[in-house]
Swiss-Prot record:
Its main location: cytoplasm. GO terms for molecular function: rRNA (cytosine-N4-)-methyltransferase activity. This is Ribosomal RNA small subunit methyltransferase H. S-adenosyl-L-methionine binds at G36, G37, H38, D56, F82, D100, Q107. InterPro entries: RsmH, SAM-dep_MeTrfase_MraW_recog, SAM-dependent_MTases_sf. Gene3D superfamilies: Putative methyltransferase TM0872, insert domain, Vaccinia Virus protein VP39. Pfam families: Methyltransf_5. Residues 333-342 have a biased composition (Polar residues). HAMAP family: 16SrRNA_methyltr_H. One of its GO terms (biological process) is rRNA base methylation.
Length: 342
């Protein structure tokens, strides 16, 4: 199988294309174009009758897609989040959908985007800089409880309360406007440890997820993708942290597997699967990690939408689809004796 251009190394490139099973005349949607590494691979397998729809909420990624593929009649470009893919495609018309979640390498590498604690820049973190509130704006007005809830819920940061109190105290003295300011402040209040991970890692992740509504978009996008796929169509999702992967795993399982029965409840209607799991968690091997260390946390999951004839053959007893909600920062979390999250 061909390899992507050296200038951009998309994670799990070969595994994604194998999972999507791209056909010459199929219709595919890349909901997170980024810099187009996976999209190029899909196009290599499409013939003149194939179609590729690309989406991205980042205006810079949209500009790259227009420059790279604007002259290709097989490609249509749609600015915006994949959560709104129902505005781009009709139901049951797509052969494959790819969602490559999280922040992209270009977003991390450009200090001016404000995503990285390793590069000083404006404290922004918005994937679409023209929409919504920046990280600096939110931190300037959120209460310490709201900040702590976000850090714990989206970053699983054990020192969430301590960090939140420090942010509120510091902003009373001077505004937090730069990524280095925030990273240094977090590092200054964290207990000393042996971890090789930067002390601001979890907090930056949590704030970014909150600012961009990433988990809300993910759940909406998964629901929309299921409706957009044809029977036999494939959904491939790459996640980069446990919160994302948990949502993806639970979503696929909810439509593929009958829930456990409960003898205390009345007999339910037979469970009819909508998805078939193509693979479990797929991770990068050592050869990929050697050239692309950022792939170390990537997890790919693939599922196939079933047609009615296949759904009936997979019927089992169950109690219907249980609600699967992503965590919200409004939820209360327990505290340890020192007042921080456990």
């Amino acid at each position: 199988m061909s390899q992507p251009p050296a200038a951009h190394v998309p994670v799990l490139y070969t595994q994604v294309l194998e999972g999507l099973q791209v056909t010459e005349n199929g219709t595919y949607l890349d909901g997170t174009f980024g810099r187009g590494g996976h999209a190029r691979g899909v196009l290599e397998h499409l013939g003149p009758g194939g179609r590729l729809l690309v989406m991205d909420k980042d205006p810079e990624a949209v500009a790259v897609s227009q420059h790279t593929f604007g002259g290709d009649a097989r490609v249509s470009i749609h600015p915006g989040s994949f959560a709104r893919l129902v505005q781009v495609v009709a139901a049951a018309t797509v052969d494959g959908i790819l969602l490559d979640l999280g922040v992209s390498s270009p977003q991390l590498d450009v200090a001016g985007r404000g995503f990285s604690f390793g590069k000083d820049g404006p404290l922004d973190m918005r994937m679409d800089p023209d929409s919504g509130q920046s990280a600096a704006g939110w931190l300037a007005q959120a209460t310490d409880r709201e900040i702590a809830d976000v850090l714990w819920t989206y970053g699983e940061e054990r020192q969430s309360r301590r960090i939140a109190r420090a942010i509120v105290a510091r902003r009373g003295e001077q505004p937090l406007l730069r990524t280095a300011q925030l990273a240094d402040l977090i590092a200054s209040v964290m207990p000393r440890g042996d971890s090789k991970t930067h002390p601001a890692t979890r907090s930056f992740q949590a704030i970014r997820i909150h600012i961009n509504r990433e988990l809300a978009d993910l759940e909406a996008g998964l629901d929309a993708a299921l409706g957009a796929l044809k029977p036999g169509g494939r959904l491939a999702v790459i996640s980069f942290h446990s919160l994302e992967d948990r949502i993806v795993k639970q979503f696929m399982a909810r439509y593929a597997k009958a829930p456990p029965s409960n003898r205390r409840l009345p007999e339910a209607q037979p469970f009819v699967p909508t998805l078939q799991l193509v693979s479990g968690a797929i991770k990068a091997d050592d050869s990929e990690l050697a050239v692309n260390p950022r792939a170390r946390s990537a997890v790919l999951r693939v599922a196939e939408k079933l047609g009615m004839e296949n759904r009936e053959s997979g019927m089992g007893k169950g109690h219907g689809a249980a609600a699967s909600r992503f965590p919200t920062p409004d939820s209360r979390f327990p505290t340890s004796p020192n007042g921080d999250a456990p």
